[in-house]
Regions:
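A generic local structural motif
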Residues: 55-57, 92, 118-121
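Thioredoxin-like thiol-disulfide oxidoreductase module
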Residues: 97-143, 147-164
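Thiol-based oxidoreductase modules, predominantly thioredoxin-like and allied folds used
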Residues: 70-81, 86-117
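A composition-driven signal for long, intrinsically disordered, charge-rich low-complexity tracts
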Residues: 2-5, 86, 146-147, 154
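A near-ubiquitous, low-amplitude feature marking generic local secondary-structure context
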Residues: 5, 42, 75, 138-142
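Hydrophobic beta-strand anchors of alpha/beta hydrolase catalytic cores
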Residues: 69-70, 133
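Residue-level marker of regulatory loop/turn positions in helix-turn-helix DNA-binding domains and
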Residues: 61-62, 84, 125
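N-terminal leader/targeting and pre-domain segments
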Residues: 1-68, 160-164
């Protein structure tokens, strides 16, 4: 799963939903909506995806040099505590000690607009739980996990294979 392709697919699906909603609201065909509101739709989508496009570009650049461990978790300043995120934290810290500079650690909190990346990577149906941890290498989402702590050994299975 290439991160750029996931972003493109998500953006196109979102565009389809916007056109469909506008067609329903204006009692018009989707083709009519696409031609009448083309500029407004494009501006809306561009604004909606601006932040996440920058994050994807940054992760793509970083992951060309070395693997990236992306960690999307609850903001530690939030009043609500994510117990799963807290149980996962020592595993991520252990990876920092084990791998040091050989991998890049990239953290996003759920209070940031960058958190939209979660939905770009995890496009399947079902409940979306924090944390999300993903290994990204050369622009590809090699593996991602959601809603549970990930054992150090699970990460190592993928990271060691990449770093060989």
């Amino acid at each position: 799963m290439m991160l750029e392709e996931l972003l493109r697919a998500h953006r196109e699906e979102f565009r389809r939903k916007v056109v469909s909603a506008l067609a329903k609201k204006h009692r018009a065909s989707e083709e009519d909506v696409r031609s009448r509101f083309a500029d407004a739709i494009e501006r809306f989508i561009q604004e909606k995806y601006e932040v996440v496009e920058k994050v994807v570009a940054r992760l793509n650049a970083l992951s060309q040099e070395r693997p990236v461990l992306l960690n999307i978790r609850r903001d530690p300043c939030s009043e609500e505590v994510c117990m799963i995120c807290e149980r996962d934290r020592p595993n991520v810290e252990a990876l920092k000690r084990i791998y040091g500079e050989s991998i890049t650690f990239y953290e996003i909190f759920d209070s940031s607009p960058e958190v939209a990346l979660y939905h770009i990577i995890h496009q399947e149906e079902g409940e979306k739980l924090l944390p999300m941890n993903a290994i990204i290498h050369k622009g590809e989402v090699v593996k991602f996990w959601t809603g549970r702590p990930v054992a150090v050994e699970e990460y190592q299975k993928y990271l060691d294979n990449i770093l060989q």
